[in-house]
């Protein structure tokens, strides 16, 4: 399953829940990558860009098959799921899958970072010394405002 930013969305949980519970999947592997475009903009700015186009993010159906499912007012920037740090996002994604009640506890869940700069796959880390020297964070893309927390 691939999505923007490798963020755990309701659709990712839905897909993982189905395959793990009914089709015998025993392992979930999360692979995120450096130089991700989801680091390159601020969620609030994206929300404003939609408003400037005449689109009201507070009044859109998230899923065309469930038009009654809408975000709470003001939650669009959080829902977009922009990120500040690939490693931190990967670690939180692993934790979210491991702790989700619809994912069986015996499913192995791991996460990895593909370093575009070094062409190396490594485990996510909070230690900046173990990251690629050229890896960027959202601040290095020029994003000055911290992203709204996806996990709270």
Over which residues does each language-model region extend?
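Divalent metal-coordination and catalytic microenvironments
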Residues: 1, 30, 119
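Divalent-metal-activated hydrolytic enzyme cores
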Residues: 6-9, 21-23, 38-151
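Histidine-centered catalytic micro-motifs
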Residues: 28-35
């Amino acid at each position: 399953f691939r999505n923007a930013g490798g963020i755990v969305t309701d659709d990712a949980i839905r897909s993982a829940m189905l395959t793990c519970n009914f089709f015998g999947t025993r392992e979930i592997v999360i692979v995120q990558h450096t130089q991700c475009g989801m680091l390159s903009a601020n969620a609030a700015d994206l929300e404003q860009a939609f408003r400037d186009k005449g689109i009201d993010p507070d009044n859109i159906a998230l899923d065309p098959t469930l038009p009654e499912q809408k975000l709470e007012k003001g939650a669009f920037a959080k829902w977009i799921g922009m990120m500040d740090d690939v490693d931190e996002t990967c670690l939180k994604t692993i934790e979210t899958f491991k702790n989700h009640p619809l994912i069986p506890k015996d499913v192995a869940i791991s996460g990895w970072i593909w370093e575009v700069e070094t062409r190396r796959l490594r485990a996510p880390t909070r230690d900046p010394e173990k990251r690629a020297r050229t890896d960027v964070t959202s601040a290095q893309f020029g994003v000055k405002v911290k992203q709204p927390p996806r996990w709270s």
